């Protein structure tokens, strides 16, 4: 009886952290870290490395030579993402680095490109709201992209953000490098504090865009629709579905109400660690398969 109670307790604790991917605001597969650090930390996951294959219509599966990896620190934060490829025996790898403060807020987002590195440095207020972002070009003192060491930084521009809250509405004004406002965003929340609409307006041209959010019965993000100006038809839509643990199981992308991409996510049933991503381009019918292998901290 005691063992049964203990098993139920362990299952309930694991269920709290069973969502490997955090898609609360639709950040999955974006540059924003989208892994649940509590889950990553609880299973002591160090990295997942994926081999990428592809299959054309009526063709066989072919190994592309590309690799993708997500690397985490012991606190569960994503620190490195890289994507490597081989073309005519020449390899090329794009690295993305993430740094955090003591509050687990992402303070530096750094990416390698053909010219070196660029970064966004971020500052937050006491409430965790982003108040400043600086874009810079950077020089690497190391010969290795993987082991980046800052030699020089050249600030290109910066933005700052002002917040005003009115009941269930948050208004964010973006200031340019000269301290002048150029953009205003309004976030609308319902009585349960779910974001259901975000409206963006450029102050000079008065052009606008809008995002609408819907949720399923368990409160997980179900869809995001993107609109420009006064158009009533979304130019883009993302739809999601989840398993019983709250893990994203598929993601569909629509353009002008036509589905163009379908992605399925498969998890290891024993650990719920992401195992495979199947992605189909519905225009070309190209299927991409990424199979991940996990590595753990001792």
Regions found by a protein language model. Give the residues of each.
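Buried hydrophobic residues that stabilize the cores of well-folded domains
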Residues: 19-298
